[in-house]
A protein has these predicted regions:
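N-terminal glycine/serine-rich phosphate-binding loop of ATP-dependent small-molecule kinases
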Residues: 1-87, 133, 140-164, 177-196, ...
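C-terminal, non-catalytic interaction/recognition modules in large multi-subunit enzymes and RNPs
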Residues: 5, 13, 145, 149-153, ...
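Conserved phosphate-binding loops in N-terminal lobes of ATP-dependent enzymes
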Residues: 10-13, 17-21, 29-45, 50-51, ...
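Glycine-rich phosphate-binding loop of actin/hexokinase-like ATP-binding domains
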Residues: 20, 31-40, 87-93, 113, ...
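Short beta-strand-loop/turn "lid" adjacent to the catalytic site in phosphate-handling enzymes
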Residues: 31-34, 61-104, 164-177, 200-214, ...
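Conserved short loop/turn motifs at secondary-structure junctions
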Residues: 65-66, 164-173, 215-218, 428-433, ...
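Extended, charge-rich low-complexity interaction segments
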Residues: 158, 218-237, 510-528, 633
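Conserved phosphate-binding/catalytic loops in two-lobed NTP-binding clefts
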Residues: 186-211, 478-494
């Protein structure tokens, strides 16, 4: 076997399953895999899954060029409050900024509401004298002796494991923070230090301080995890690059991940959006709703012209998971998506009012849904899907895991139907209707906020449960077109292989367009580009392959929040003022449906995204031949009732095949059920494309079309 490094592996650690995709560029081989997540030791599932994929493809660990993975470790650490003991050194007088926050109520109707608990208690927050003005000039020198005494006290008396340094206006001039790190390193060389001017060099001291503290909070844990994972993989013989997915959809090096682990807060979900963007672009779909439904949550985001929407702020560790404002603010680039507690493992129960409620509690992988026969007793969405015919009890994970249909029937009858006084069939249908309506309502609101109409989009469904629920969701959204990629159940792991190595950076510099110092703006970009180039070259890139994209956060003077606007390639000058203004007005009109022609426009932050190209990967399979139709089973479709449905072996289909619904398409990791009003076509990339409401007479009947195809 050649020892040339030709294999890339993507790994997605989810709440229920860990998904894998292996791609060998020379052999043109792509193989997927799925294992139950091991929450007590996340790296174990990774190592076991990689070992299995290598064995199945007759490969060696020495052939692996890179392993890219996303992790929920940062998110879980913040949610569970299991991070390091952190100390904060700030400007004197700003010790309590974390508790003061924005001084707003996230729920005006809840008189007993509690803010998200701060992760750095007051005893570990201390201010020191020294001040930088808003224009970057030094107003008062840093009190270095007081700083040293404060750090000694925090480490020796309070036992802090990591420090955050956040001085006022450091985004404009980081000199005091840089000097502080020098002093701390001389005192405690091994202490991990986060500077707010490096992790979030933008205005708004509360958000910047919160980001720095949360970065310090998760840093020791991520250092340990990444070191352990690297050692475990090295024992397999792996000597390639280990890379991590960023929350914004790019891929970064282990060194960057260790320095700024907070940028991995949405690492896992971003991969699904990147996979959706890659698939949509290859298929020529300009407007797509990415719908990723796994075992724990459902995530939706918009993908337009081959790129997912992104935003530059995020809220972590919410007291109420789905209430905006109840968490801790972060200045990080993330894929702009909505997430609701509606996954295959979401538990259905009768609440105190005698009504059925689904989620956000999830059965996860342990004990899992009742169908898994691993000790679960509470019925879940997956159990309802099995009961209603959407899943094949003998072909879950390609037959690796038999599903316990009798146990599911009994659990729904005793836990739900009995308490509600309804038939078991109605209870199962109720679970599915509730979860579909929850996802539809969240998607409608997300799109309405952006002035978008779902009817003009294609629903791209993936995740283990996404294709199962795609038809029901599409009907509620009045979407007419559904696309289901091959390997849909592991498509998030595929996203790691098609995401580009990337650096996102920003600098705060506030000024009105007509008075901006454009030379200073160009200096900011020169610094950001130099740093980005260094990171990407260390990641193995070539200088000529690096693509730089500039953007800025602009607003009308006096507004509290801004909108991102793409900038022309630099260097910039006063001659670009009108082009920047026009771009802002267009973006503002698209979002708010109005503009104010005479109001001054103000720039807040200047952003850079630098990336390398990525080698295209396809999950297309080679048709197995034989007859695709496996028989029939009864499936309940909303609006049609129980319908005898053709069962199709997806692996036997080839491009150009057409199937009139109702039909359920089975593959190892997921199933797609197309209703009676669908016509499904297999495109050149082996995507299933379902047209809802298409004229079924124009499509061949399943038996005839598929018989002729073979």
């Amino acid at each position: 076997v050649s020892m040339e490094k030709t294999i890339r592996i993507g790994v997605d650690i989810g709440g229920t399953f860990t998904d894998f995709v292996l791609h060998d560029e020379v052999r043109g081989l792509t193989r997927t895999g799925k294992r139950l997540t091991t929450p007590e030791a996340p790296s174990r599932a990774i190592v076991e899954g990689v070992e299995r994929l290598l064995a199945e493809t007759n490969s060696r660990a020495e052939q692996i060029h890179s392993i890219v993975h996303g992790t929920t470790l940062v998110t879980n650490t913040v949610l569970e409050r299991t991070g390091a003991k952190v100390g904060l050194v700030c400007t004197e007088g700003f010790r309590d900024v974390l508790e003061m926050g924005r001084e707003i109520r996230y729920d005006p109707d809840d008189l007993a509401q509690q803010p998200a608990p701060v992760i750095v208690p007051r005893a570990r927050r201390w201010g020191v004298r020294g001040r930088i003005r808003a224009d970057g000039a030094e107003h008062e020198p840093l009190d270095e002796s007081a700083l040293a005494a404060t750090v000694r006290m925090l480490v020796d008396e309070h036992g802090v494991e990591a420090l955050a340094v956040a001085f006022m206006n450091s985004y404009r001039n980081p000199a005091h923070e840089l000097r502080a790190r020098q002093i701390i390193s001389e005192l405690y060389p091994d202490l991990l230090v986060t500077l707010s001017s490096e992790v979030a060099p933008e205005i708004r001291e509360y958000d910047r301080t919160s980001t720095a503290c949360l970065n310090a909070y998760v840093q020791p844990l991520m250092h340990g995890y990444l070191d352990r994972l690297g050692a475990d993989l090295a024992r397999l013989g792996f000597a390639g690059d280990l890379r991590i997915m960023l929350s914004g959809g790019g891929v970064t090096t282990i060194e960057e991940a260790k320095a700024f682990p907070i940028r991995l807060i949405e690492s896992g979900p971003a991969a699904g959006a990147m996979a959706a963007a890659h698939i949509a672009q290859a298929a020529g779909e300009a407007k797509v709703i990415s719908f990723d439904m796994g075992g724990t949550t459902a995530k939706m985001c918009l993908v337009e012209n081959g790129a997912p929407h992104v935003k530059h702020d995020f809220e972590a560790g919410r007291v109420h998971r789905f209430k905006q404002g109840s968490g801790l603010p972060l200045k990080v680039t993330v894929v702009d998506m909505i997430e609701i507690g509606a996954g295959g493992g979401s538990i259905a129960a009768v609440d105190a009012l005698g009504l059925m409620k689904v989620g956000p509690r999830s059965a996860g992988s342990v004990p899992g849904p009742v169908a898994y026969a691993r000790g679960g007793t509470e019925p879940t969405v997956t159990d309802a899907d099995l009961y209603l015919g959407y899943l094949n009890p003998d072909y879950f994970l390609g037959g690796e895991m038999a599903l316990a249909l009798d146990d599911v029937r009994a659990a729904i009858a005793t836990r739900l139907a009995g308490g509600l006084g309804i038939e078991t069939n109605d209870a199962a249908r109720g679970i599915q209707e509730i979860v579909n309506e929850s996802m539809a309502a969240a998607t409608r609101m997300h799109m309405a906020e952006k002035g978008k109409d779902p009817r003009s989009y294609t629903l791209l469904a993936f995740g283990g449960a996404g294709p199962v629920h795609a038809y029901g969701l599409a009907k509620l959204l009045k979407v007419r077109r559904i696309m289901v990629p091959p390997g849909a159940g592991v498509i998030s792991a595929f996203g790691f292989l098609v995401a580009a190595p990337e650096v996102d950076d920003a600098r705060g510099y506030v000024g009105q367009l007509h008075t901006l110092d454009w030379d200073h703006v160009n200096q900011l970009y020169a610094g950001m580009e130099a740093r980005a180039r260094d990171v990407l070259l260390r990641a193995g890139g070539r200088p000529e392959d690096i693509v730089m994209r500039w953007s800025a956060d602009l607003r009308y003077l006096g507004q509290g929040f801004e909108v991102p606007v793409d900038l022309p390639p630099g260097p910039l000058s006063a001659n670009h003022r009108e082009a920047v203004r026009a771009a802002f007005l267009q973006t503002y009109a698209e979002r708010f449906d109005r503009v104010f022609e005479d109001m001054p426009i103000e720039a807040i932050n200047w952003r850079l995204t630098a990336s390398l190209p990525v080698t295209p990967v396809s999950l297309a399979h080679h048709p197995t031949g034989g007859t695709p139709e496996r028989g029939h089973r009864t499936i309940h479709f909303p609006g049609f009732g129980d319908v005898s449905t053709a069962v199709i072996d997806r692996y036997a289909l080839k491009p150009g095949d057409r199937v009139a619904g109702p039909a359920v398409f089975e593959e190892r990791e997921s199933s797609f059920a197309a209703g009676p009003d669908c016509v499904v076509t297999v495109d050149r990339d082996f995507n299933l494309v379902a047209e809802i409401g298409a004229d079924a007479a124009t499509a061949a009947a399943p038996r005839r079309a598929l018989a002729e195809a073979t």
